[in-house]
Amino acid sequence: MKTGKIIKVSGPLVVAEGMDEANVYDVVKVGEKGLIGEIIEMRGDKASIQVYEETSGIGPGDPVITTGEPLSVELGPGLIESMFDGIQRPLDAFMKAANSAFLSKGVEVKSLNREKKWPFVPTAKVGDKVSAGDVIGTVQETAVVLHRIMVPFGVEGTIKEIKAGDFNVEEVIAVVETEKGDKNLTLMQKWPVRKGRPYARKLNPVEPMTTGQRVIDTFFPVAKGGAAAVPGPFGAGKTVVQHQVAKWGDTEIVVYVGCGERGNEMTDVLNEFPELKDPKTGESLMKRTVLIANTSNMPVAAREASIYTGITIAEYFRDMGYSVSIMADSTSRWAEALREMSGRLEEMPGDEGYPAYLGSRLADYYERAGKVVALGKDGREGAVTAIGAVSPPGGDISEPVTQSTLRIVKVFWGLDAQLAYKRHFPSINWLTSYSLYLEKMGEWMDAHVADDWSALRTEAMALLQEEANLEEIVRLVGMDALSEGDRLKLEVAKSIREDYLQQNAFHENDTYTSLNKQYKMLNLILSFRHEAEKALEAGVYLDKVLKLPVRDRIARSKYISEEEISKMDDILVELKSEMNKLISEGGVLNA
């Protein structure tokens, strides 16, 4: 290992000379305390290093030792239910080692627990030919996650020895005879974070990732293996949307990256997730979650690493055949870290001071999402769905981070400050948001939920757009100038907004809505419209239609529990009978 010498320190950036044997992206130990850093630029024998820990106390002349390895993560049993910092140091072990509630400098802790024994059950046998990605056994990591142990990349040969029993992550579980000699396999493997894990082939995403949030699932769905952006100003509810998708999203593994956001928000996740039950398994949500906390007061450089660490862990579970979602909150803070490092490197700035390579770095991250066939004999299919929050200053979505993100992702959930001020949550603006997966997801919904799902969605969306146009007229000449048909449209659109799109994240029945319940709710609201139009044609006054008692039941249908969905069919029957009664009375009276 070559030792260099520091010649300059500028915040998280350290420049060292005598580093001619090092490579870009090598990990180095900086100073007497051995702070972890990564080389981001080489000029002759001078290396520019971004340090992932606080650099106070380091000065020129201090040593820099290269490890000769890129920044890598340890992948194996013990990831689920863990909380790491940006460079995969477990925070609980960190606290014990540092004996402090705050991050101390130069503390070395292993990413995965070396003492804990895991029960390994082999699925391969001696004599089997194996190559990269083949599953050789399993470990029941939590009640929900079966951890498949795969042959690491670069290993191909015949199994010479394989053992069942309890092992820690460093003990040998199998020996593979390769052309270059015997290779020992353990429960753990390492992977460089900046390099995407290989797969056999990419697939077209065709299935929606349901979230239980009506505005998302019905109007702007994201596919399993898709990418979505959630831009919005402060206080618009980005973090709650991310939490809701993490809690109720239809994925088997959740990787939640808190990147440069408030520490309290990560505390919320830690407090809430263990108590919440997964609707599919009945187990705690924490039993399928990996948390990476890189809060706003932690070193800036580690924000970049935290995003890559998160996506690498997500790809690892994808290779096992799982559907994984990764939440990054917020990519703007990561971009700000890039801007700070770029400024200290004295690079030519791009828009608003961000580096010229901002777009390509964002693309590197989002392009690692997708649905794939993993390497290995059994053709496992896995998916990584990436959902990134963006925090544009002042809610201005024309700024570089939002624009670069929108060029890459296919789903845009635009949060609106005006809706948030009106206490309309989730404050996703239905007129500016979009999903490019809509057509494919509509086909899936028509086949699996109800054959008129797409038709109902199109009708509801058209009503909301008509409402926006009619509101202009109402502002100018008042409601009285509208025809009864137009007034009915406004009332139904209001019902869609307040009774369907608005959702209470803290109400036990309203926080999550199944696709079946979503269909029945939307069908109820639009059935009211169709029945009301018949009544108006029969000569019934609109005021009478709007005063029907069944309207209250339609509005409160969102609070019906999933077990009592059949009550909605009763409301539909009641709606039709009340309307028919009005028509039989009103039609005669007004004839």
Swiss-Prot record:
Q: Which PROSITE patterns match?
A: ATPASE_ALPHA_BETA (PS00152)
Any single Gene Ontology cellular-component annotation: proton-transporting ATP synthase complex
Gene Ontology biological process: proton motive force-driven plasma membrane ATP synthesis
Q: State the top-level EC class.
A: translocase
Keywords annotated in UniProt: ATP synthesis, ATP-binding, Hydrogen ion transport, Ion transport, Nucleotide-binding, Translocase, Transport
A Pfam family annotated for this UniProt entry: ATP-synt_ab
- Residues that hold ATP according to the record: 232-239
GO molecular-function annotation terms? Answer: ATP binding; proton-transporting ATP synthase activity, rotational mechanism; proton-transporting ATPase activity, rotational mechanism
**Reaction(s) catalysed (UniProt annotation):** ATP + H2O + 4 H(+)(in) = ADP + phosphate + 5 H(+)(out)
E.C. numbers: 7.1.2.2
The record's NCBIfam families line, in alphabetical order, gives: PRK04192.1
**Protein family membership:** Belongs to the ATPase alpha/beta chains family.
What does this protein's UniProt record list under function? Produces ATP from ADP in the presence of a proton gradient across the membrane. The V-type alpha chain is a catalytic subunit.
**Protein name per Swiss-Prot or TrEMBL:** V-type ATP synthase alpha chain
Classification lineage = Bacteria, Bacillati, Bacillota, Clostridia, Eubacteriales
